A protein has these predicted regions:
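Residue-level marker for the onset of beta-strands and adjacent loop->beta junctions
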Residues: 20, 27, 53, 91, ...
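Secretory pathway targeting signatures of secreted, lumenal, and periplasmic proteins
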Residues: 25-27, 32-76, 108-110
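A short, polar/proline- and glycine-enriched secondary-structure boundary/capping micro-motif
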Residues: 42-44, 76-81, 140-144
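Signature of long, low-cysteine stretches enriched in small and polar/charged residues
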Residues: 78-129, 136-139
Length: 163
């Protein structure tokens, strides 16, 4: 009986931790990430204001990381590797009149042993305005993180309007 109560309590507490979110405030964006992940600013803002234009959020077991990049001015990130010639637009994003394009790139098992996958959003002049992605060890890790990753992507909010 005690083992059952302990197991149920552990499940409920674990579920609560996974459901909780924290906010990360970047230079010009906010994103919600799982409370049990570790957040680390990656690429400093050029504004010299102790903020970041990109961040990495790593799971407690270090098998999955989420990535977000939202530059102050459109440009490629320099803190990750983006495969050159990243491809054909996947879909239009935003309002019907928007000319933003979403591109995809991914590369498998570089030297670090993770699979990396990124969605790159570009403006009408093909300048990068946002990159969101993740890296993972195995397909099992990928599948286990799907819901959290979808919530992470949907939580992105741009706080400044780019010129």
């Amino acid at each position: 009986m005690n083992k059952l109560v302990i197991a149920i309590l552990f499940f409920v507490l674990t579920l609560g931790v996974y459901a909780q979110k924290k906010d990360f405030y970047g230079s010009n964006f906010t994103v919600k990430y799982p409370a049990n992940f570790t957040a680390e600013g990656s690429m400093p803002s050029a504004n010299n204001d102790d903020t970041f234009v990109s961040a990495i959020f790593t799971s407690p077991d270090k098998k999955v990381s989420f990535y977000i990049y939202s530059p102050n001015t459109p440009a490629l990130p320099t803190d990750i590797t983006i495969k050159e010639g990243f491809g054909v637009p996947l879909a239009s994003s935003g309002k019907k009149k928007s000319k933003n394009k979403v591109y995809a790139t991914s590369f498998y098992e570089p030297k670090d042993g993770f699979t990396h996958s990124y969605l790159i959003t570009c403006d009408e002049n093909d300048r990068v305005t946002k990159v969101v992605g993740r890296r993972y060890k195995t397909i099992k890790d990928l599948n286990a993180s799907d819901k959290l990753y979808d919530e992470f992507k949907k939580s992105f909010q741009n706080r400044k309007i780019r010129k």
